[in-house]
């Protein structure tokens, strides 16, 4: 594994640790497990999109390329800006 790959996976680990810690701290506020899981997955996806967009670590910013078409799906947009429109989360 090269240094850039280590940085990538370390950042994913930070995201995972944050999501676990946050969800454990708020677990009692949820009436349904589905709502808790919805928020955990939303947070993780949002933070991964932030990482791709270059907002979580100054050393990381990526283009997401569809290798079949060659199109860059994050061309001229920030992926994390679209999470709220497409993904579910609660107000807890």
Model region roles, listed by residue range:
Residues 19-23, 40, 44, 56, ...:
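Short, flexible helical or helix-coil boundary motifs
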Residues 53-92:
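Amphipathic alpha-helical binding modules
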Residues 26-47:
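Mature extracytoplasmic domains of secretory-pathway proteins
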Residues 1-32, 54, 58-66:
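N-terminal low-complexity, intrinsically disordered segments
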């Amino acid at each position: 594994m090269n240094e850039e790959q280590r940085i990538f996976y370390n950042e994913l680990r930070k995201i995972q640790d944050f999501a676990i810690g946050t969800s454990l701290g708020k677990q009692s506020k949820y009436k349904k497990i589905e709502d808790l899981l919805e928020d955990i997955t939303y947070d993780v996806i949002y933070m991964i999109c932030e990482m791709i967009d270059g907002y979580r670590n100054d050393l990381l910013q990526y283009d997401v390329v569809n290798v079949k078409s060659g199109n860059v799906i994050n061309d001229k947009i920030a992926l994390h800006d679209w999470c709220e429109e497409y993904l579910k989360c609660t107000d807890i």
